[in-house]
């Protein structure tokens, strides 16, 4: 490994550690405050909705972003095609979740869940819009920008959630936290990446990315389902 590569590795480890510690600390502090202002049922509603939001997030955030990061020969057409595919998928999944909200609420036996899910549904296209830029930042070893993005989203999203909780918004304070965090994530990433997609789409370049991204997506979804299946089943059984 060259000296430049070693410096890049050390730089990456340092900022990744800053990101991990910062997000954990701010998230914990925000949770402590929100736990004093909100009820367990508020957190329960968000957890029920979160199962589906996290699933949609995984579908748009995993796969293409990692393929952009790790593919050896990357052309502008790969980047633009991956971005437009992610945007279309994110919008479609967000719309599907919005439409399915009443049925999900009925499954859980929680009428209030319909509105919560619908307000959270924009998180999915917001995540889809940053997957490729994040992949490009990782490819360029821009770990400092990635760390700032995550810490700011956790901090300011948490502040927004706490303000909403102080105003008596109940479960929607948690929704505000998620929406503000995802929006700040989008703003910081796009400010840092210095890249714009072309108005072009290539099936050939899409096929180049699908093989690798489908493997990552499949393994990521299996891991996600194994972690969140219990949450879903408990919500269905105890929802009434």
Segments predicted by a language model, with ranges:
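Membrane-interface junctions at transmembrane-helix termini in multi-pass inner-membrane proteins
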Residues: 9-10, 67-76, 126-150, 167, ...
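Residue-level signature of transmembrane alpha-helical cores of multipass secondary-active transporters
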Residues: 12-20, 50, 86, 119-120, ...
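Helix-terminus/linker motif at the lipid-water interface of multi-pass membrane proteins
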Residues: 28-42, 105-107, 165, 224-240
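Membrane-water interface segments that mark the loop-to-transmembrane alpha-helix transition
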Residues: 7-27, 45, 49, 54, ...
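Interhelical loop/hinge segments that connect adjacent transmembrane helices in multipass membrane
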Residues: 1-5, 9, 144, 171, ...
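Generic alpha-helical transmembrane segments of integral inner-membrane proteins
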Residues: 21, 25, 29, 33, ...
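Hydrophobic alpha-helical transmembrane segments
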Residues: 114-121, 149-195, 211-214
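Alpha-helical transmembrane segments of multi-pass membrane transporters/permeases
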Residues: 10-23, 76, 122, 136-162, ...
């Amino acid at each position: 490994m060259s000296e430049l590569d070693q410096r890049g590795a050390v730089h990456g480890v340092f900022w990744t550690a800053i990101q991990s510690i910062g997000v954990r600390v701010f998230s914990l502090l925000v949770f402590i405050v929100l736990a004093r202002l909100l009820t367990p049922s508020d957190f329960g509603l968000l957890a029920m909705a979160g199962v589906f939001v996290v699933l949609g997030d995984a579908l748009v955030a995993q796969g293409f972003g990692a393929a952009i990061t790790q593919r050896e020969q990357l052309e502008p057409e790969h980047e633009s095609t991956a971005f437009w595919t992610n945007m279309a998928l994110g919008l479609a999944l967000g719309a599907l979740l919005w439409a399915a909200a009443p049925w999900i609420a009925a499954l859980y036996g929680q009428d209030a869940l319909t509105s919560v899910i619908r307000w959270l549904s924009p998180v999915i296209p917001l995540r889809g819009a940053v997957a490729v830029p994040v992949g490009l930042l990782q490819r360029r070893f821009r770990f400092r920008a990635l760390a700032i993005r995550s810490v700011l989203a956790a901090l300011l999203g948490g502040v927004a959630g706490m303000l909403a909780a102080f105003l008596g918004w109940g479960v929607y304070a948690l929704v505000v936290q998620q929406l503000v965090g995802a929006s700040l994530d989008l703003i910081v990433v796009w400010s840092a990446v210095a890249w714009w997609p072309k108005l072009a789409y290539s099936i050939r370049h899409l096929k180049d990315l699908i093989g690798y991204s489908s493997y990552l997506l499949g393994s990521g979804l299996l891991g996600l389902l194994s972690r969140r299946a219990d949450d879903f089943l408990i919500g269905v059984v105890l929802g009434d």
